[in-house]
């Protein structure tokens, strides 16, 4: 989706744009700093202050929303993967402003590993639930099939019983109401 520099994407007239919409807005406004696709670049430490100052007159994005957006952006797998030791950090206009040190690179690698582990655990739990539901459904279908087979083998007595009861009931009701009407 292409975003014009001074406009936020229209999200069905929402008053608060989503994090993704703001990231798209920032990528359009500061293309040398933020990206939506491809490899991300490590951001300057303290970039949030620079960003808040640069967007101070922008009514579309509040400081709180900027903090949420930066948190989301910097916790993405794409961003964490780019934070390698000695990688260049960049400012809003794409200028080099420092490097990622060993401790920061290790923290990013650990955060990425934890995020991937949590994702794998959620996926495994979802697969477990899907398997459980599948086998419950299969067992239910097998029980129903066995019940139907038993009914067919016995000559479907339930259907005959219901039919006789219905015919007898109708005969009684007809007799009862026909006497009263005559």
From Swiss-Prot:
- Spans annotated as Disordered: 125-160
Q: Which UniProt keywords apply?
A: Chaperone, Cytoplasm, RNA-binding
Residues folding into a coiled coil are none
Q: List the disulfide bonds.
A: none
Highest taxon above the source species: Bacteria
List the record's Gene Ontology CC terms alphabetically.
cytosol
Has the keyword Metal-binding been applied to this entry? no
Q: Does the keyword RNA-binding apply?
A: yes
Q: Output one GO BP term.
A: post-transcriptional regulation of gene expression
**Principal place where this protein is found?**
cytoplasm
State the compartments where it is located: Cytoplasm
Q: Which GO terms describe its molecular function?
A: RNA strand annealing activity; RNA strand-exchange activity
- What InterPro entries does this protein map onto? ProQ (IPR023529), ProQ/FinO (IPR016103), ProQ/FinO_sf (IPR036442)
Could you say which protein family the record assigns here? Belongs to the ProQ family.
User: What function does this protein fulfil?
Assistant: RNA chaperone with significant RNA binding, RNA strand exchange and RNA duplexing activities.
Give the protein's recorded name: RNA chaperone ProQ
**What organism does the record attribute this protein to?**
Haemophilus ducreyi (strain 35000HP / ATCC 700724)
Give me the gene this protein comes from.
proQ
């Amino acid at each position: 989706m292409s975003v014009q520099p001074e406009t936020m994407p229209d999200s069905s007239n929402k008053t608060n744009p989503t994090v993704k919409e703001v990231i798209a807005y920032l990528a359009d406004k500061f293309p040398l700093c933020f990206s939506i696709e491809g490899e991300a670049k490590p951001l300057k430490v303290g970039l949030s202050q620079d960003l808040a100052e640069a967007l101070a007159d922008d009514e579309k994005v509040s400081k709180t929303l900027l903090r949420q957006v930066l948190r989301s952006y910097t916790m993405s797998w794409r961003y964490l993967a780019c934070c390698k030791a000695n990688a260049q950090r960049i400012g809003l206009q794409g200028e080099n402003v420092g490097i990622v040190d060993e401790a920061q690179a290790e923290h990013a690698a650990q955060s990425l590993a934890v995020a991937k582990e949590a994702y794998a655990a959620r996926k495994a739990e979802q697969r477990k639930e899907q398997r459980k539901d599948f086998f419950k459904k299969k067992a239910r279908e097998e029980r129903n099939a066995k019940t139907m087979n038993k009914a067919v083998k016995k000559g479907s007595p339930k259907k005959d019983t219901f039919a006789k009861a219905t015919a007898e009931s109708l005969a009684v009701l007809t007799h009862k109401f026909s006497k009263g009407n005559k």
